């Protein structure tokens, strides 16, 4: 009986919180704070133990990882846009190195103790939106469902 009571209380609390939660999650400041919290947890529990190894502490390793991330990102995006006409819907396969490069750059940023900024988050959202747009039907046609850009973001993206 007490289990049913706890479930009803939990659903009542959820129904009270949920309408405001969606609006709060649209705020870029909240998104960046949430990302920094998750990155902080990852830094303490995953990154710091890895960083104590001698090879990761070397500057050569860090520079190599940054260069590798940039090369993967640029090569993946370039191949996607250059070969999309010839490959059609299969051109999205070239986004795999770009996504790996993006993840590598973000991980390197975390390893170098730099927090996520609103600019980095906007760049990441734009790249994820473009990736989703290509992955869903092989074309860039703003058919995103998950990573959508607000009208203010799309106007600032077209202005720059």
Curated annotation (Swiss-Prot):
Recorded topology in the membrane: Multi-pass membrane protein
GO cellular component: a single term: outer membrane
Keywords, in A-Z order: Membrane, Transmembrane, Transmembrane helix
Transmembrane segments: 63-83, 92-112
Entries under InterPro entries matching the protein: CRPA
Main location: membrane
Subcellular localization: Membrane
Entries under Pfam families matching the protein: CRPA (PF05745)
Name this protein carries in UniProt: Sulfur-rich protein
Taxonomic classification: Bacteria, Pseudomonadati, Chlamydiota, Chlamydiia, Chlamydiales
